[in-house]
Amino acid sequence: MADATLTRAPEGATGVLVLASGDVIWGRGFGAEGEAVGEVCFHTAITGYQEIMTDPSFEGQIITFTFPHIGNVGANHEDVEANHAHALGCIVREDVTAPSNFRAAEGFDAWLKARGKIGLAGVDTRALTRRIRVGGAPNGVIAHSASGSFDVEALLEKARAWPGLEGMDLAKQVSCEAHHLWEGGVWKLGFGYEGAEKRPSTSLGTSGDSSGEGSLVPSEVEGRSFKPHIVAIDYGSKHNIFRNLVKAGAKVTVLPATATFDEVMAHQPDGFFLSNGPGDPAATAEYAVPVIRQMLETGKPLFGICLGHQLLALAIGAKTTKMFQGHRGANHPVKRLADGRVEITSMNHGFAVERDSLPPNARETHVSLFDNSNCGLELTDCPAFSVQHHPEASPGPMDSMYLFEKFVGQLRA
């Protein structure tokens, strides 16, 4: 890592990462040209880079992929978790320029470029990951210019001026703009996600495109005449969450993050879902928590994932805290306390619920086997539960998929 006094890239370098600490990391730029400032984190998944880049929870973040080769299977028009890429950019050891997969429509480089996202290759990602692990997730600027000319001092000032994710509400930026009915199921070999989703184009988010990515096939839930109605609050949800709620047999209506309790109840829900999303839960809680508390008072079942888990905790009086460096990967072991079962899970969070702040009516249900942090809770006085990890995977293992069936089962009871 170089000193920030350098303003001209070394020979062959067309990209740079400038950290707020003053570290300058040179590499080869790919994807779109430009610059972006945000929090630099790392993700340990081997595959699923498309799903990761399009996960709304990565709004405001620059991802370091720890697996050395990224882009092996190219990119397609289906493996996305939102209608555009939310991560600011990515850092890789080596980007694969000759992908091989029967579903590939283009290379990762072209995919990033089409979405205005910056890539930086040729980086010692092991060293950068160690730096994040030891020093915490830093603010930084990623930049790509074919000319190789960068004003490093100016980039450093931008990195240092960026306020950071703590105290930042990003859910409003990535939430849908209007309510819509989610129709569809999971991906099927030979069919993919055929057919257009029946929802207005205005509800795709503030930066949505019209590419049709993530479109779904109609749900087929055999032997279930009653479909309980879930109102899902979209704080930045992944598509695969809604797919699996529908697969479990529910009807899902999605509402914006700022929906009021009256707007929620106007849809006559049987239960409530709180989605994942980016930013500081304490900031989002200012408008989300009053609504969640009213939801709990109805006595109807409630399920939360990731940010939704944190918001439920805040609604019952618990506290959240910024992690030194978050959990982001597809192989995180979580222990289910009820029976000792270990579930391998997908995780993506930089904030956590403080276990010691949980009130008496909250029971801890899951813990991380990496650092013993809280990963789940349930209330003893009403049918509400939540988990910090991502049972919908995408990418990742499916050990926790039963949670969708559990929730829909509560709605049918």
Segments (PLM) and residue ranges:
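Intrinsic disorder/low-complexity segments
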Residues: 1, 195-227
